[in-house]
Swiss-Prot record:
GO terms for cellular component: cytosol. ATP binds at K281. The lineage of its organism: Bacteria, Pseudomonadati, Chlamydiota, Chlamydiia, Chlamydiales. Its main location: cytoplasm. It comes from Chlamydia abortus (strain DSM 27085 / S26/3) (Chlamydophila abortus). It comes from the Bacteria. It is an enzyme of class 6 (ligase). Keywords: Aminoacyl-tRNA synthetase, ATP-binding, Cytoplasm, Ligase, Metal-binding, Nucleotide-binding, Protein biosynthesis, Zinc. The gene is cysS. This is Cysteine--tRNA ligase. It is found in: Cytoplasm. A motif ('KMSKS' region) lies at residues 278-282. A motif ('HIGH' region) lies at residues 38-48.
Length: 476
């Protein structure tokens, strides 16, 4: 990878719009990044977090290469699903979505995802959406249907389909669709303002010049992005399932309003499979983050699992894969522990370790600059660990070398966010509960129960050691 004229390494990203890898060149500083966030009708599942981890990696790599970033991630707190949930439970929309929003932020922290600069909620931008709908109506791009909903006329946007590479003139279009989500076979005019239906919507609606109702999902993102980042942004990211219709419709709305390109780069992560199959509650392979935490896996292990594959490849999520990630993190933890051992004092870094470190940093940078190739970056990391361990084994290692290697690891961890520098373990709540129960059993001299609990703790990948100061929990 070459360096750019401003001494910043060239970064290449696969642009869904062109179906090619392109040299990243932002319009201005900071980079304007918009990512599709959660629809808070339920707890986010690991498929969602595969996308959020990819978006976090993208942001971290931009920061690593010296870009400043203004990041907006939306929260969809009104759509078909959130409305249905609130009505079913006969509560307000805010009351229904609040626990899922709170859980989302807790999950983000658990997975060490860097916070966005703003998390706009759709319900906070209704007035701006109404202004946009009025303009689209006045320009003849939108119309009011017989059901009193407002629709975007896709024939009024000649380049409709350019992101998903649909040829509009070759498709059989139905008249209109009011659902937020649909597939290409149901290509149609899409809803901007969904008219109120008492039986469907209960007590939830907003007043508007077009009648009671609520905004369409696609319009929400367009307005929040343009309000917070301006009419044209640098990168819009999400999952492949967002390409059509969501991102396609965002482009149509936004560019009809601003007459400017909405986003210069479009990045999309592939689907996550569980044991080779699509995740489904009916198949029993549907997992939220808290499901996995309750089974004894840590946030770092789950992050590593979701991080390790290239974002444009499907990720097969398995328990065996999680166990392998646990071992990879143990190898990192053991390496750091070894680096923190005492070594001979030296005022300078050994030439061999300096060359090894510089070569690794270049290989790591080249990998992530090539469309976020994290698999190659991780391979270079473990090769660096192997080479460093060999020098330690040969007693060709000093205290200065140790500090140098640790500094390199801290630098690349600004990208990875998984290297366990802290010696304190992140103990899952279920393991902590079992340790507490075992301690009670020991105090009651119920040795049989204590052994049963020890085995249960071991099944989560932890070992408990009894010391004078109390139980100590370690990973295998």
């Amino acid at each position: 990878m070459r360096q750019s004229s401003d001494n910043r390494q060239n970064l290449y990203l696969y642009n869904t719009a062109s179906r090619t890898k392109e040299l990243f060149s932002p319009s201005n500083d900071p980079v304007k990044l918009y990512t599709c966030g959660p629809t808070v009708y339920d707890y986010a599942h690991i498929g969602n977090f595969r996308t959020y981890i990819f978006e976090d990696l993208l942001k971290r790599i931009l920061l690593f290469f010296g870009y400043s970033v203004k990041h907006v991630m939306n929260i969809t707190d009104v759509d078909d699903k959130t409305l249905a949930g609130a009505c079913k439970n006969n509560i307000s929309l805010d009351t229904y979505t609040a626990p899922f929003i709170q859980a989302f932020f807790k999950d983000v922290a658990t997975l060490h995802i860097l916070p966005a600069d703003a998390y706009p909620r759709a319900t906070h931008y209704i007035p701006q959406m109404l202004v946009a709908i009025r303009k689209l109506l006045d320009d003849g791009i939108a119309y009011i249907g017989q059901d009193h909903s407002v629709y975007f006329s896709i024939k009024e946007f000649p380049s409709y389909g350019k992101l998903s590479q649909l040829q509009l003139q070759n498709l059989q279009c139905c008249s209109r669709i009011a659902s937020d989500e649909y597939d290409k076979e149901n290509l149609s005019d899409f809803v901007l303002w969904k008219a109120y239906d008492k039986h469907r919507d209960g007590h939830i609606y907003w007043e508007s010049p077009f009648g009671k109702g609520r905004p369409g999902w696609h319009l929400e993102c367009s307005i929040m992005a343009m309000e917070l980042l301006g009419p044209s942004i640098d990168i819009h990211a999400g999952g492949v399932d967002n390409i059509f219709p969501h991102h396609e419709n965002e482009i149509a709305q936004s560019e009809s309003l601003s007459h400017q390109p909405f986003s210069r780069y479009w990045l999309h992560s592939e689907h996550l499979l569980v044991d080779g199959k699509k995740m489904s509650k009916s198949l029993g392979n549907f997992f939220t983050l808290r499901n996995l935490l309750d089974r004894g896996f840590s946030g770092a292990e789950i992050r590593y699992m979701l991080l390790q594959s290239h974002y444009r490849m499907q990720l097969n999520f398995t328990e065996e894969g999680l166990m392998a990630c646990r071992q990879a993190l143990k190898r990192l933890r053991d390496f750091i522990s070894r680096l923190e051992s005492p070594y001979p004092e030296s005022a300078t870094i050994s030439e061999g370790i300096d060359q090894c470190g510089q070569r690794f940093l270049q290989d790591f940078s080249n990998a992530i600059a090539n469309d976020l190739n994290i698999a190659a970056a991780l391979a270079s990391l473990f090769d660096f660990i192997h080479q460093t361990n060999s020098r330690i084994d040969q007693s060709h290692f000093t205290q200065a070398d140790s500090h140098y290697v640790l500094d390199i690891l801290k630098k690349i961890n600004t990208v990875l966010g998984v290297i366990p520098f802290s010696t304190s373990l992140e103990i899952p709540s279920e393991v902590a509960r079992l340790v507490e129960e075992r301690e009670i059993a020991r105090k009651e001299k119920n040795w049989k129960q204590a052994d049963v609990l020890r085995n249960q703790i071991a099944s989560f990948g932890y070992v408990v050691e009894d010391t004078k100061s109390g139980p100590k929990v370690k990973k295998y």
